[in-house]
From Swiss-Prot:
Coiled coil: none annotated. Keywords: DNA-binding, Metal-binding, Nucleus, Phosphoprotein, Transcription, Transcription regulation, Zinc. This is Uncharacterized transcriptional regulatory protein C1683.13c. It comes from the Eukaryota. It comes from Schizosaccharomyces pombe (strain 972 / ATCC 24843) (Fission yeast).
């Protein structure tokens, strides 16, 4: 066989593995194409497409060993009890396995394709609004609008619009200057977009530039700008945050809920996150709960491919999927923070995972307008960019599916054997998740490469979930039995990893990119460190003091964006003071953390007191 001549070595790609022929013959390969061995023998040089198999992490192997050990103990226990008790134990375990299979079987049922008749279409400012009715609805299917009656919205041709034209959007008592709006949008999409990816950035900006569209509304604009104002270094802009949020809240409640659409749901989610981050937990829980209810009302829990709406574009369908998974993710994270049951369940949905949306060339002109004002928006011109951002979103969704299992299976009353099986099973799933994430999202304590902020945040969230799943029920380390001490060591390892991630994060990034859920991550690690202090080992005590200092400093910086973090920091200090075991240690001057708030000020903040309590059972 005649081989192609080799190109210049400098211009050739170097593969990560040897070619197939060299590997089979166990000879040295220069990993070029073709390699010098194949050229020498005049043979075809072939590189397999499959990536290198990574060795299973130690933690994943240990999790599997825990599961095997549990089932061995379960079988031995079965052998020692009577037949009646055996039947009950087997039935409990069997019910758990069956429920898991039903809950997480993602294969859509054939009946899903017939759900079209349970939708009706409502006109909404020339845009489509879907309203879903289930099989038990009181509205006759014959009265529902058919798909042939749905108007098709076609986007107008892009045209250059002067800045002054945009001011017509704000004919309200409060006037938002275009330059201010532009700067706040730039801050939001550059610093916080990875925490709000249920808002499809590219098409929101396009419709904003056009003055209207299905992915833009004034209440969503003001809600987004209120987040941008929270992270602004300019005090004048920061003071605008409450005003903008109040306007968005009034508009969405007075007008948006009359005929809600995608932007109504997105606005409620943005406002919900903002209110929780400010410490107004009831208001945040209310707004997010309204958004989760809208998911069912708008039929977002059903995959658009199972409808018969041929006029819906791929982008329309993908935005609906992204909105659903955004709601699903926030539902789990908020429920995790509050210790409450989730509102959205996988068994009620057949929505496929979202994907990376294509960048459209027509967006260049709107993006250029933002770039003329500031370089803050320059990163956006790459479209929905950097595959790592989308991969971060997709893998966070998969992690939240495991969190959902933890919330529904672990934190509720069950028999001890089934509860232990659930914990072991979920712990194994978490280890499998961390082992299977893409290479660009991988991180470990020995990583030398530069790591993005989203990767660090994803690993912080993962380790906080490990802590919550395995943390002991008693805060006194000396009262833990051998099994609880083993699981506590898992928590201690994750807490140390979170501290290390924090140190790496703040060396390069600032608090502007931190999500609201960071407060829960930090306090979860702090709780384990406080338990470790009860072990009364001097060497560990010094390390714990340093770790608590790092966490409280991080929360104090985060409080510039999310005020709730300052309450969390004060609560950690209060809990630390209660850990002191001698009058000398109770002396404020001897505390290594150099702040001493009064007890009236830090008695316990209501919004996060569950973090320092045993696992919530509901």
């Amino acid at each position: 066989m005649q081989m192609k001549p080799r190109q210049d070595k400098k211009n050739q790609e170097i593969f990560r593995i040897s070619c197939q022929r060299c590997r089979q013959r166990k000879i040295k390969c220069d990993r070029l194409h073709p390699c010098f061995q194949c050229v020498k023998s005049n043979s075809q040089c072939f590189y397999p497409e499959d990536p290198i198999r990574r060795r299973a992490p130690k933690e994943y192997v240990e999790a599997l060993e825990r599961q095997i050990a549990f089932f061995e103990a379960f079988v031995k226990k079965l052998a020692k009890v009577g037949s009646d008790e055996q039947s009950l134990m087997i039935q409990d375990m069997n019910n758990k396995i069956v429920n898991e299979g039903n809950e997480y079987d993602q294969t859509p049922d054939i009946s899903a394709r017939k759900r079209r008749k349970h939708f009706r279409m409502l006109p909404q400012n020339n845009f489509r609004y879907f309203q879903f009715y289930g099989t038990t609805n009181v509205i006759s299917a014959s009265n529902l609008t058919t798909t042939s009656e749905i108007p098709t919205f076609k986007f107008p041709i892009f045209s250059k619009r002067k800045y002054n034209d945009t001011e017509n959007l704000y004919e309200q008592p409060f006037h938002l200057e275009f330059d201010t709006c532009q700067e706040l949008l730039s801050l939001f999409f550059l610093k916080q977009y990875h925490n709000f990816m249920f808002v499809f950035r590219d098409y929101f900006i396009r419709d904003f530039e056009l003055g209207g569209g299905p992915y833009y509304s004034q209440w969503l604009l003001f809600a987004i700008c209120s987040i941008g104002a929270m992270i602004s270094p300019d005090d004048d802009l920061k003071n605008l945050s409450n005003t903008l949020a109040n306007i968005a809240e009034k508009w969405v409640l007075d007008e948006g809920l009359n005929s809600p659409d995608i932007t109504t749901l997105q606005t409620l989610l943005v406002l919900g996150i903002r209110e929780i981050g400010r410490g107004l937990t009831f208001k945040g829980w209310l707004f997010s709960g309204m958004a989760f209810r809208l998911v069912y009302d708008m039929g977002l829990h059903l995959d658009p491919d199972h409808w018969d709406h041929s006029e819906e574009s791929r982008i329309d369908r993908e935005v609906r999927r992204r909105c659903f998974w955004g709601c699903f993710t926030l539902d789990k994270l908020i429920s995790l923070c509050y210790g409450r049951p989730p509102g959205l369940y996988l068994k009620q949905t057949d929505v496929r995972n979202t994907t990376q949306l294509p960048y459209i060339s027509e967006l260049d002109e709107p993006f250029e307008i933002f770039n003329k004002k500031s370089e803050l928006f320059a990163a956006v011109s790459a479209g929905e960019d950097r595959r790592g951002l989308v991969q971060f979103w997709l893998n966070q969704v998969e992690l939240c599916k495991i969190i959902h299992r933890m919330l529904t299976e672990v934190f509720e009353d069950r028999t001890s054997s089934v509860l232990e099986a659930s914990i072991n099973n979920i712990h194994t799933e978490l280890q499998k998740w961390i082992a299977d994430i893409p290479m660009e999202l991988q991180w470990n304590t020995r990583s030398q490469k530069e790591t993005s902020s989203t990767v660090l945040l994803l690993h912080m969230l993962y380790h906080s979930v490990i802590i919550i799943l395995n943390r002991p029920s008693d805060d006194n380390y000396l009262k833990l039995d051998n099994t609880e001490r083993y699981t506590f060591e898992i928590c201690w390892k994750s807490a140390k990893t979170i501290v290390q991630l924090l140190k790496i994060y703040f060396k390069k990034y600032d608090a502007d990119c931190l999500p609201m859920t960071f407060i829960h991550i930090a306090t979860s690690a702090a709780r384990i460190i406080l338990v470790k202090l009860n072990e009364n080992i001097p060497e560990d005590g010094d390390v714990c003091n340093i770790y608590l200092e790092i966490i409280t400093n991080a929360l104090d910086v985060c409080a510039n964006v999310w005020p709730l973090a300052s309450q969390a920091s004060r609560a950690i200090l209060n809990a630390y003071k209660s850990c002191a075991t001698s009058p000398k240690e109770n002396n404020e001057d001897s505390l290594p953390l150099q702040r001493s708030p009064s007890l009236d000020d830090v008695s316990r903040f209501d919004s996060l007191d569950y973090i320092f309590s045993p696992n919530v059972k509901y």
